[in-house]
């Protein structure tokens, strides 16, 4: 177990008083309700950290009151009276004694802005709980008056702004005083105790709904939003709400088109760091997701799940027009192009009709469902992009040759033809290609792999296009039996 090692000096015993903060009744009454709630949360979290590390024997009386939801009241006053010598020290004396001001004290002091009082250091001569203050250590007045004699005390009494500036400054030396056995140093015991939970693996904060435990109370509060379905962070552009501010910040990049995460290898930029990490696996060749049936590995878990359907025979994608089922969604999209072409020739499916149907969802339907094929989408923007497959709309046109595309990514890929860029090179023979999947097809020439097999004669092919061309020998058109092209029995 990691122990607290003060720097410098011998090892100190950690008790609740090291991380506790006490107030007088006057100070407590100056706090707003949200500040009092902050005090309760921090005290309970500090106690939980100590308990998880095994430093506590008996539960402090302050914690018992806070757990019951009662006001600390008289207990705070009693502790303050017992600690009047500490509370009466001026700022210089506190620095000499090595008394460190906690972050909670500074935060509450800045929020409260108590005039004439440095937090935990009353104006000299101010009675605490009816008890007179002891003689001033710097030769201050002994007549019981509450006039400040400290050089900065008069400024504090006159200007709350100067007080807040002082409260924002660390008291004492800025060097860390507590060091963990792992080498990391902290200025406060409470921060060290929170860090030590990493080494112990303790998770003292448990969710009452599902039983899941967490290392910090802040993470527990964030988790509990899942059960309450509360989404306090709302986008000002589209109104979509999120549970976390980080999710909202990532969502904003959809509207601003900002892509701050760039790949160091190829320069491609992404709006989220997770997508950049996923992309970098293509350069490193890392394939962490392996199939338990055949051992084949993949870069993405989604691709592994698709591959698993080859072994299980599952075909979750069904065409609503003809009932044909497919393993992959991409196969279904290719199949729908046949229906879209037929509908365009008959005048039955047009862009306006599809968009109108998409904007008129029926009762009980998902909010974003394709009116032609029934495929659901989480966002309306994805549905509109998908509808171009049915309408044949191609808004992205090449400035060089005038060829149009339904997606900007396809246009970018096409433009490599004009720039003659071929970023994907074979490591065996050095031949380069514009597309990664063309390189993968080329690799089969070296490996001898032929995954596409004809059902009629059993002939295997290394490319899908070669198999489609071969099927014409048996009297099949390329558009027929689209499902069979990627069926499990076709793979060798």
From Swiss-Prot:
May be involved in transcriptional regulation. GO terms for biological process: regulation of transcription by RNA polymerase II. This is Zinc finger protein 517. Belongs to the krueppel C2H2-type zinc-finger protein family. InterPro entries: C2H2-ZF_domain, KRAB, KRAB_dom_sf, Znf_C2H2_sf, Znf_C2H2_type. It comes from Homo sapiens. Residues 14-85 form the KRAB domain. One of its GO terms (molecular function) is zinc ion binding. It is found in: Nucleus. The lineage of its organism: Eukaryota, Metazoa, Chordata, Craniata, Vertebrata. Residues 139-168, 474-486 have a biased composition (Basic and acidic residues).
